[in-house]
Amino acid sequence: TTVAATKLTSLKATAGKLGYREICQVRQWAPLKSAMPHFGMLRCATSTVVKAQAQAQATATEQTTEEAVPKVESPVVVVTGASRGIGKAIALSLGKAGCKVLVNYARSAKEAEEVSKQIEEYGGEAITFGGDVSKEADVDSMMKTAVDKWGTIDVVVNNAGITRDTLLIRMKKSQWDEVIDLNLTGVFLCTQAATKIMMKKRKGRIINIASVVGLIGNIGQANYAAAKAGVIGFSKTAAREGASRNINVNVVCPGFIASDMTAKLGEDMEKKILGTIPLGRYGQPEYVAGLVEFLALSPASSYITGHTFSIHGGFAI
């Protein structure tokens, strides 16, 4: 018997003598351990409560974080002359990267639609716009189309261009004007229109496609060389003026890039051209597109502006 039981028996006997029947009817005390919860059960219950509280807190934290972090919108990009060649490669590269792309073209509507379709197959968004970038009304309409569709413009790649090659002494003024209007004035008009939009949100990137010919000249391309050299000088000024509004302007100068035109060159001509390139081969449109993507989207390029990048395999070292 326990000490508690002995005391209870003694108490009952004493109470009986004194006539306190109620006390005699008191039930036997239960052992102390049966009156207390098992520590193992207590631990389990406590653990369950703690886990539930932690889970609830984690869920609340996740919800708060989701609400606090703003949704990142896909950059809106306008690429001129994007239906083929370098422009096509740039549009596809930016589309793959998640951009919303306006694919500009002048005459190649079918090809532009194919580019747009490919971007959508990658999971991106794209629209096409037929317009002449040397005409102010077309440029304004193009920019408005992008803004109406997606709300803003983040990046512009001025790639549209033509050639009208002939020796200087034989060049007609119309050939000069046509190349200057599209290759230089077109860059001016698109950059001006885009800058007005970008200034409002104090952010934007403009990449102008020039040429190695604008750096070193080339026989039979006085008009083209003048236009591309003009693009380089123009871009440096635009970079200085846009810097206070966080608008970066840079230039890419391709050399000999594989195209439908190079594919039609004879073996002898190709051998001569490749002999002038230290790397001994043509560049690919995707090489240019990769550089443009870096300048357009990478945080690492945010401190680069007013710079001219050559991508020519060493041709103009």
UniProtKB/Swiss-Prot annotation:
Transit peptide: 1-57
Localisation per UniProt entry: Plastid, Chloroplast; Plastid
Pathway noted in the entry: Lipid metabolism; fatty acid biosynthesis
E.C. designation(s): 1.1.1.100
Sites where the protein binds NADP(+): 79-103
Stored NCBIfam families: 3oxo_ACP_reduc, PRK12826.1-2
Protein name according to UniProt: 3-oxoacyl-[acyl-carrier-protein] reductase 5, chloroplastic
Lineage: Eukaryota, Viridiplantae, Streptophyta, Embryophyta, Tracheophyta
